[in-house]
């Protein structure tokens, strides 16, 4: 039986924490779609195409991971791709509150859509794309938090 899961997010940019979760999800499910939200209302630093390209580059070794951009409701995207599992990361209690609301809304829109929550590895539990961008803007060392191609792209954006 093929189990298709979706790991959605903005991934602006994709971090080592995201990579940790998608790697672990790829070991749990037959096929994982890393679904990158357009999220234009969030005013991302990277365009959707740039985020998709970076994610494809860093997930290339994961043969059962596909990277796609999307702009529709997650429930619609899941239906279109015949997936019934959403993978989400929970870094803290504050993440849980938001994720709980999302999971319930997605289940309302698509009753067979289940949310599976993964706790990040401890060394990545404090990382977020926003925090990494803030560190980079102030000249801090971001190399421990991002895959090398992403570090290069982020530093180029800020140059």
From Swiss-Prot:
Pfam family membership, one: CTP_transf_like
Pathway(s) of this molecule: Cofactor biosynthesis; coenzyme A biosynthesis; CoA from (R)-pantothenate: step 4/5
Record's subcellular location: Cytoplasm
Entry EC number(s): 2.7.7.3
GO cellular component: cytoplasm
Its biological purpose: Reversibly transfers an adenylyl group from ATP to 4'-phosphopantetheine, yielding dephospho-CoA (dPCoA) and pyrophosphate.
Protein name: Phosphopantetheine adenylyltransferase
Organism expressing this protein natively: Yersinia pestis
